[in-house]
């Protein structure tokens, strides 16, 4: 028993002495005696786990990470050939469906949330798609000409250019602010606080362009004011001459309507078409016989021109109401359009009949 303990103590002392002579670096653990191979098994499991984590999470631009799902989402956006595919909606999608799709994708692809390569461009494409499809006029124009423009700009089936064919009135950043007030729903992350380099370049470039434009406008402002005055000078001269001419000219001998300011308060009718007109108290002394007949022809011509213009306006108003009723399927507008009377058109028909009869 003592011999056994003695040999065990000697073995322990020898092991400690070996450890002292061969110290391991602090950053490398000592290799342990593993006759069963358990350590190798655990090491294999760790390497396998590390490979799985790498397949799920990869390094993005800078020190940010992104998932495989985010990368696949960006690649899907790049492959889309129209705005409907980008938002993942049908061509007859309603406004609510468009808003719902945009809200979901904007949060998913915002550069603060998605650091995958191309996420910024995908975010811009999503914003541009919603800005166009949410505008009735632009959506109608896109539905009519969008496919033709795709064929023209991409004859070799290249990815669709989302930024040139249809220009929007609002940037993706401003559109995101409209929906989320400049913040994510959590309220913690501000717009573009950690975006990629191309987005910073995009914002710096536009800031520089705005400053340059403002500087040029300030430099050209005096010259622009002077040029505008020179251009308006002929118009001002014409207006002044016209006013002076009207002040110096004598009052017209008649009016188609009652005008007390001109003294045209006495009602008369033309002999041929019974067109009503108004004159002053001295009219009978100035116009008799042939001069009266010539003047009444002029009156009838002026009246017919006035009635024709009024008739055209009535038809235009009725046509617009009818089109609006059909567009919005509004029964009230339809009834209003049908009940609208074309009084001046009826007067014009009577005048034409009288002229033919005369």
Swiss-Prot record:
- Domain J as annotated: residue spans: 82-146
Q: Which organism is this entry from?
A: Bos taurus (Bovine)
Official protein name in the record:
DnaJ homolog subfamily C member 18
Task: Please indicate if the UniProt record lists Protein biosynthesis as a keyword.
Answer: no
Family annotation (InterPro entries): DnaJ_domain (IPR001623), DnaJ_domain_CS (IPR018253), DnaJ_subfamily_B/C (IPR051100), DUF1977_DnaJ-like (IPR015399), J_dom_sf (IPR036869)
Identify one Gene Ontology CC term for this UniProt entry: endoplasmic reticulum membrane
Keyword annotations from UniProtKB, A to Z: Chaperone, Endoplasmic reticulum, Membrane, Transmembrane, Transmembrane helix
Question: Gene3D superfamilies from the entry?
Answer: DnaJ domain (1.10.287.110)
Question: How does the UniProt record describe the way this protein sits in the membrane?
Answer: Single-pass membrane protein
Instruction: Report the transmembrane regions from the record.
Output: 228-248
């Amino acid at each position: 028993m003592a011999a056994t303990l003695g040999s065990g103590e000697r073995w322990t002392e020898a092991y400690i002495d070996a450890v002292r002579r061969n110290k391991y670096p602090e950053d490398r653990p000592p290799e342990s005696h593993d006759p069963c191979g358990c350590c190798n098994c655990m090491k294999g499991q760790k390497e396998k786990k590390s490979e799985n984590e790498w397949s799920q999470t990869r390094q993005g631009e800078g020190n940010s990470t992104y998932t495989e799902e985010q990368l696949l989402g960006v690649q899907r956006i790049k492959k889309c050939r129209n705005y409907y595919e980008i938002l993942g909606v049908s061509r007859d999608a309603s406004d609510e469906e468009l808003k719902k799709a945009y809200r979901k994708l904007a949060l998913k692809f915002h550069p603060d949330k998605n650091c995958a390569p191309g996420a910024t461009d995908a975010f811009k494409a999503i914003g541009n798609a919603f800005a166009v499809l949410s505008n009735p006029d632009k959506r109608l124009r896109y539905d009519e000409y969008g496919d033709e423009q795709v064929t023209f700009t991409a004859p070799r089936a290249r990815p669709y250019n989302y930024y040139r064919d249809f220009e929007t009135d609002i940037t993706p950043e401003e559109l995101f602010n409209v929906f989320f007030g400049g913040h994510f729903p959590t309220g913690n992350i501000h717009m573009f606080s950690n975006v990629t380099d191309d987005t910073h370049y995009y914002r710096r470039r536009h800031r520089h362009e705005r400053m340059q434009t403002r500087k040029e406008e300030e430099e050209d402002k005096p010259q622009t004011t002077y040029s505008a005055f020179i251009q308006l000078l002929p118009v001002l001269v014409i207006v002044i001459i016209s006013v002076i001419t009207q002040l110096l000219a004598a009052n017209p001998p008649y009016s188609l309507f009652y005008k007390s300011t001109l003294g045209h308060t006495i009602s008369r009718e033309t002999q041929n078409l019974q067109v009503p007109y108004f004159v002053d108290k001295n009219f009978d002394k100035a116009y008799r016989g042939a001069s009266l007949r010539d003047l009444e022809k002029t009156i009838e011509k002026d009246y017919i021109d006035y009635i024709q213009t009024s008739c055209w306006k009535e038809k235009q108003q009725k046509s617009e109401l009818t089109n609006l009723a059909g567009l919005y399927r509004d029964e009230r507008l339809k009834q209003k359009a049908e009940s609208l009377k074309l009084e001046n058109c009826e007067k014009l028909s009577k005048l034409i009949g009288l002229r033919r009869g005369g």
